[in-house]
Amino acid sequence: MTFETGGPRGNDIGLLDGLMTNRAMRRYTDEPVADEDIWTCLQAAVQAPSGGNIQPYQFMVVRDPGLRIGLAELYRRGWARYEPAIAPSEFPNDAVREGWERNNRATVHLAENLEHVPVIVLLLMPSIDMTVHDDEGPMPVGPTHASVYPAIQNFMLAARSLGLGTAMTTLHRIYEDDVRELVGIPERYEVLALLPLGHPTGKWGVAPRYRGADKITSWDQFGEKRTP
């Protein structure tokens, strides 16, 4: 099965086409995003499954230019600390080095231009402990985040179908308290993710992955591999 690579397309793309060709977009034009398209992405997001249908999230859509500048400044402060901390001292081969450098250039571009993206969406999650207990003790069924990430994925796929690009970022969390203060988010909410939303300058396509599904999948017993 093959999937298309190319520029923006309408909402006639198939589900698998969207899944296989959606990728993090970090370069955007300054073309506005229509309210209708924002609502479509939000409505798709809330249709995502969540544990017990609890929908443990809130969305904040930021379009005000001053607020976008403020978020961008906090994002850049975080990136200035984060980039040198993750820079590898060596690479196993040239392909890995080239891939890292290409991704880093795109990440730097987003950090330097975030305020120019027409829409920034923040994903909020209440800071609550969902652990339940019985007579035998706590039952650690996993963090609440597991019921938020599917909504983020739905949002991103809906954007893809509309010819819009986005990327899930978390660098803002380095200065999360400042982000809350800037846009008036109560302290009880964790600002889980930041998603730029706009018209991308790049192309969609099947992104290169260094490990295919056959390399990271076991069948019945850990380490038992199959070929597709």
Question: Which ranges hold each PLM region?
Answer:
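Short catalytic-loop micro-motif centered on adjacent basic/acidic residues
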Residues: 27-28, 58, 165-169
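A glycine-rich helix N-cap at a beta->alpha junction
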Residues: 80-92, 183-208
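C-terminal helix-cap and adjacent tail motif
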Residues: 2-11, 25, 190-228
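Generic N-terminal amphipathic, Lys/Arg-enriched alpha-helix
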Residues: 14-31
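Glycine/small-residue-rich phosphate/adenosyl-binding loop
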Residues: 61-147
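Glycine-rich phosphate/pyrophosphate-binding beta-alpha loops
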Residues: 46-54
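Glycine-rich, charged/polar anion/phosphate-binding loops
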Residues: 44-46, 104-109, 179-181, 203-204
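Small-aliphatic-rich amphipathic alpha-helix that forms the alpha element of a beta-alpha
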Residues: 43-46, 121-182
